[in-house]
């Protein structure tokens, strides 16, 4: 949580005239030839950064052992520097390796190349400037709304530094600042010379070095969201040699931009949106749900294979946000994922991601499938996280097991392996409390029918089977019987014949955004059917006789 600083904001002119937004384009012919719909931020490549803007630190290594640097000037081994990368910048903008120098040198960020504008002349034309420590905002929009935007960037800057690390200092000692251009009347900005002739077309926003351009938005929330999104790009990519792939660059810009401002003025970034009304104009959760409804669900591999051209449409922004949100909020994966924040300009980024995905491949694919199919506003990632525990079979000597299942968590392992073709008796007892408002609702294992979730009463105990890693699939659609999306109702109890071998997982049915206020646990007993248990005893006796 960060409080928005009360930074002085410069207001130098009266209200500017509003007009209907148009695509930024130098000519009608070019607009006709290049018009296309792009959602979210538009991909662009910054012009070359002068090589003298960045210095390096070299130690007493031989020339053949020279090291490269990450975004904070930390040295990388020659082995790490050879790892395969996919930089999201034009190769022409990537600086060549400076001559070897054994003397330590100070690392500086690239020089500030923002143009100097005549703010008084712009004010006379109807374009105001609002300035804080980190943002100089030029806009022709309403003064009251515009005045609050630069302090928001000052607040998110602190969150960037905490997550990614501080940028190297400027050569002249100045603070890092951006220019933002928030546009209602395109012609006004173009006539004022605030839109570069070589700036590619965009529908919502575009950035270049420490400048960004964005259109005025219908909703207050999405105006702030887009502002933070573009500013995040400026911060993440200002140092040369970006190694992080496009899904991470766009996903993290979306992730930081999802924010909530409290009544006391404090602001939270990287939040899970709670409702379409409070996050008006954003729509990423709806896009993911619509994608699954259209049988266009995306796997982790699909998302990480995307290139910049894929982001000429809006859906990849939603899926990239979803993957970053999932990995950063999940208690099992977030520590490893957050290490990537210091590797944006580091060639080790790709090997670190590969190690993360390889180490947790089966669990990741399983939980991503569940996350992306169950995603809803207010989704509780911590409560939904699964503690995977492989089960063991019941035996004639231990024909049953009893397991507590908490009401405030998602899927929980029973520790029992159900074998294909075997029939099991599952019984449940106990009472739990669902929600506190408008009053506490008590439920038994069969659930309560005053409210339903996924077409079942909330409070109903349900189960599913989780297969071993060698049976994993990374394809979330269609529903396969070997995935945890194929669940079944248990209630007070049921007789269940396993169609395939897997560990039994259980949970109390409730919306994924409502788990945190549930209390209590039910007791679940799992045992073989009488016939199967007797058959198992006969097999056990025959094996003992043979061994003797």
Region roles according to the model:
Residues 25-39:
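Bacterial N-terminal signal peptides
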Residues 40-45:
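Bacterial signal peptide processing site
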Residues 49-90:
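Post-signal peptide N-terminal segment of mature Sec-exported envelope proteins
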Residues 51, 57, 311, 343-421, ...:
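Beta/coil-rich, acidic/histidine-enriched accessory regions frequently appended to metallopeptidases
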Residues 99-115, 122-245, 260-263, 294, ...:
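Juxtacatalytic substrate-recognition/specificity segment
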Residues 123, 194-218, 222, 240-380:
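Acidic/His/Gly-enriched intrinsically disordered linker/tail segments
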Residues 421-425, 498-510:
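Noncatalytic modules at the cell exterior or secretory-pathway interfaces
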Residues 434-490, 532-544:
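Surface-exposed beta-strand/loop patches in noncatalytic accessory domains
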């Amino acid at each position: 949580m960060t409080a928005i600083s009360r930074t002085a904001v410069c207001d130098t002119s009266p209200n500017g005239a509003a007009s209907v937004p148009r695509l930024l384009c130098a000519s009608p012919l070019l607009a006709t030839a290049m018009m296309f719909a792009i959602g979210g931020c538009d991909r662009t490549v910054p012009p070359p950064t002068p090589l003298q803007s960045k210095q390096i630190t070299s130690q007493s290594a031989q020339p053949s052992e020279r090291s490269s640097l990450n975004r904070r000037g930390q040295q990388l081994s020659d082995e790490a520097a050879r790892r395969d990368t996919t930089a999201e910048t034009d190769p022409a903008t990537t600086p060549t390796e400076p001559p070897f120098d054994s003397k330590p040198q100070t690392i500086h960020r690239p020089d500030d190349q923002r143009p100097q504008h005549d703010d008084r002349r712009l004010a006379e034309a109807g374009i105001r400037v609002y300035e804080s420590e980190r943002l100089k905002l030029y806009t022709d929009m309403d003064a009251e709304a515009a005045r609050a935007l630069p302090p928001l960037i000052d607040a998110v800057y602190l969150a960037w530094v905490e997550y990614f690390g501080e940028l190297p200092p400027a050569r002249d000692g100045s603070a890092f600042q951006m220019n933002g251009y928030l546009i209602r009347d395109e012609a006004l900005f173009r006539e004022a010379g605030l839109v570069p002739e070589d700036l590619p077309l965009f529908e919502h926003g575009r950035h270049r070095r420490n400048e960004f351009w964005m259109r005025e938005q219908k909703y207050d929330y999405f105006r702030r969201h887009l502002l933070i999104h573009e500013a995040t790009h400026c911060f993440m990519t200002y140092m040369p040699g970006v190694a992080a792939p496009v899904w991470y660059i766009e996903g993290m810009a979306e992730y930081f931009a999802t924010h909530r401002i409290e009544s006391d003025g404090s602001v939270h970034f990287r939040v899970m949106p709670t409702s379409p009304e409070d996050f008006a104009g954003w729509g990423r959760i709806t896009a993911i749900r619509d994608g699954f409804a259209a049988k266009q669900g995306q796997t982790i591999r699909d998302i990480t294979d995307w290139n910049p051209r894929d982001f000429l449409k809006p859906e990849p922004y939603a899926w990239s946000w979803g993957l970053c949100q999932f990995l950063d909020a999940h208690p099992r994966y977030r520590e490893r994922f957050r290490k990537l924040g210091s590797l944006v300009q580091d060639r080790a980024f790709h090997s670190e991601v590969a190690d993360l995905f390889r180490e947790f491949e089966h669990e990741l694919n399983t939980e991503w499938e569940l996350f992306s199919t169950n995603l809803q506003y207010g989704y509780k990632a911590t409560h939904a996280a699964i503690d995977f525990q492989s089960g063991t079979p019941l035996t004639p000597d231990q024909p049953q097991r009893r397991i507590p299942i908490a009401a405030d968590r998602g899927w929980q392992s029973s520790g029992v392996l159900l074998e294909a073709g075997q029939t099991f008796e599952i019984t449940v007892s106990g009472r739990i409390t669902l929600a506190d408002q408008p009053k506490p609702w008590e439920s038994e294992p069969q659930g309560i029918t005053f409210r339903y979730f996924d077409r079942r009463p909330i409070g109903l105990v349900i189960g599913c089977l989780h297969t071993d890693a060698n049976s994993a699939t990374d394809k979330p659609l269609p529903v396969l019987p070997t995935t945890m999306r194929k669940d079944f109702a248990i209630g007070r109890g049921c007789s269940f014949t396993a169609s395939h071998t897997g560990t039994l997982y259980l949970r109390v049915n409730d919306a994924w955004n409502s788990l945190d206020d549930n209390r209590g646990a039910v007791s679940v007993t799992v045992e073989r059917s009488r016939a199967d248990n007797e058959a198992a005893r006969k097999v056990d006796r025959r094996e003992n006789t043979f061994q003797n």
